Amino acid sequence: MASTIMSQEVSWTDILEKHPALRWIKPIPEDWEIFPKHLCAFESFLYVAVGQEVRSLDCRLLKHKNEASHKNFYKKLFNPELDFMIEQICLSKNGRFLAVVGKSKIVILGLRSKLSEQNPLAESVSNFGESVNNFSNSEHQENGTNSLKLSEVTICSVAVINPSSQIVSVRFHPLGKSGRSLVVLTETSLLLYEAGNGVLMPDYEIPLKLTHQASNSFDADVDLHIPTAFCFSNVSQGWGVFTIYILTRGGDVFSVCPVMPANAMIPQDVLKQIRLILTKKEDDADAENHRRNVHWITKLLGEAALANDLSTSFVISEGSSELFDSSDYVSVRRPDDFSFIPSMQGPFLLQPAVADDELIEDYCDIYSFGMNPIDVLAIGGSEGRLDLLLLVSEVSGRWSKLNDHGLASMKLIVSQVHSLYLSNNNPYMVLQPDIQSPYSLIAYHANGLHVVDIESWARDLNLNFENSEFLNNEEENDEDELSNVLVSIPSRTSVLERLDTNPLNESTDAVVGCAQLYYPSLGKILISLTRNWQTTVFDDSDLATMGVNKESLSNEMDYSKSLGTSSLEQVDDLDEKLTYTPLYVSLLEKTPFTDPSIPSLVERTIVPAELQNEITVSSASLRFLGKVVARYRETLNLLDHGCSELHHRLKLQREEYERQQNHIYKLSDRISNFREKAWSTEHLEHLTSDMSMCEKRIDQVLQRVMDLRVPDLSDKEKQFIKEIGNYKEKVTGERGIEKRVETLKTLLQRTKPRDAQTTLVASSSDMRLAAIEQLQKLLAQQSLSIKELKTKTVSFQRLLQTS
């Protein structure tokens, strides 16, 4: 029984790292080709490709179920069409369809949706709901004491695709209705498919023309013109939602626009922006293309108007159990024209041009950040290099005749603004979006995983371009502002290394998959999978801390130091009478553990396979252990230095507390002496003079504060000045302490001993005792007010030092 119950102290992320669904029993040969994109996720479900099978895992069972049988449970998605080695898998946006990709075959599987389980109306939404929801549990297996439960689930294949050329990349179109529009990039063409039952033929085909040379001519750079990846433009305005960027091995970027699924869901805002294109005037050279764009847009708007008349106000989103307002989206069909097809545009000219020695010959992936109004593209190379490009030219719809597959003559320009060298000796690099921020992307390659963030400079760059006056203004100030943003891009681009799988530069354990889970009960999870089936999980605590640029940190520290020294110098320039001691200097100092050199992240490394089983002494093991020991030795040295600094800080605090305690003892002695001594008018006059001196000090401090801070006084400072005025009114007002002291003085003068009757002497002594008691209360109240006033002044002075 003890082996069947999972310990509650083990985190569910640790269980996920050792889950049997992410393991393969068969040994991996050394010459096995590396195929990335073996991992994808939707909400709490994780899908992984293992050999010729696809496994599904619900991460909610790992966190909310206590039995070991639930902890080790996963499903194997079985289909007779999966008879090939899987190279990549791709999931639709709504999580209903999974594309399993081989070298020359694609199988689209229909997955069970939450809507089909909860809402009976789902059957009317889907045209092939029976095939999608036809699940049958065929067997359950238990493996010894580990309680391994495997449920083999038969999935009816929605579609089978057999392209005529080798498959390069596969993605589901984000505008596709029901998520069944698949875009396939092969070595010769760009294909669009609408998922249905049986073997599919392409719904739309755009031949690739990646060079200006004739097809029958000799091309020395034919290997560089092979497509390697494509991505959708994430720009949500104008033509951007219909644009696809294609990357070649030589680093050339091409665009195809417009590319639209046969059945699409388009936002109303996009249609409003496209209407503006109808009023835009074009040059005479582009008159024919402008007429084609107007014809295509007019058909699209007609389909949208007809759909608005026939649709209801609220519909159920297919693949989800939520209602959404149909006034925000329009379901339209693609306006096909059988005599014209979208034309290839490019290649984009790189301005300014880079040197020949900086060029690499094998680019792998491309990604669009979707910035408005100027987009930022990222392209990754096999040598671990990541280039950031600004899309200077505006991409619009371009058309060509059906028999003419030439390139568009329009010159498009991109500008390379920064290059990052993430690693070396990489056969590939994969770029994918980050759920944490639209300004960041995840780049994983054979040697690890990095997160690149451009938010700090992308916002400033877009603000410059959004200003319409700036676009028509040639003043130097605006140009200088833009140039300052462009120059600061290298220093303001944040790069964080999440995983290092090659610490010795000799390992072959490459990252073959990366996925992100985002579910309310699970949080945000980043998962990576390596070739040797090593799984690494980063939860919210790991993802919360982002790398900070060292240069910006040093500038901020220098600025804070300059502010601190200037404020201390201003305090030292004050009169000695105005300084209140002791000051808590140690509390104003920065804690040593906020030093950015002390790492706050848990460093994750992949241990070599020879160290996981029986430890054998070899040169590689010794180098690895030496590197790990050196890293932790540096960290321990930093922590030791921080502990010594903290010990010194605590020592200063102890001395200050002891000094304050001695000061309190002295004050208590003085109070006891005051109580024992007889009160006289001279002593009251002395107290009155001290009170006036205190008022003068307060006035001087206020005057200096007003000179330094006006007109930039904060709300707390204004409130503090108001409180000081109230204290002054209590002391010097009509009903203040001074008036009451004057009355007591006259009362004491009247009660001096003189030759009188015993009854009068007795009455005068009683009056004297009553006056003394009242005076003691008044002095106690006065000392309390002065003490509060001193405390306020010290806190305000400390606030000035820290600001």
UniProtKB/Swiss-Prot annotation:
Component of the nuclear pore complex (NPC). NPC constitutes the exclusive means of nucleocytoplasmic transport. NPCs allow the passive diffusion of ions and small molecules and the active, nuclear transport receptor-mediated bidirectional transport of macromolecules such as proteins, RNAs, ribonucleoparticles (RNPs), and ribosomal subunits across the nuclear envelope. InterPro entries: Nucleoporin_Nup88 (IPR019321), NUP88/NUP82 (IPR037700). One of its GO terms (molecular function) is structural constituent of nuclear pore. Functions as a component of the nuclear pore complex (NPC). NPC components, collectively referred to as nucleoporins (NUPs), can play the role of both NPC structural components and of docking or interaction partners for transiently associated nuclear transport factors. It is a peripheral membrane protein. This is Nucleoporin nup82. It comes from the Eukaryota. One of its GO terms (biological process) is ribosomal small subunit export from nucleus. The keyword Transferase does not apply. It is found in: Nucleus, Nuclear pore complex; Nucleus membrane. One of its GO terms (cellular component) is nuclear membrane. Pfam families: Nup88. Keywords: Membrane, mRNA transport, Nuclear pore complex, Nucleus, Protein transport, Translocation, Transport.
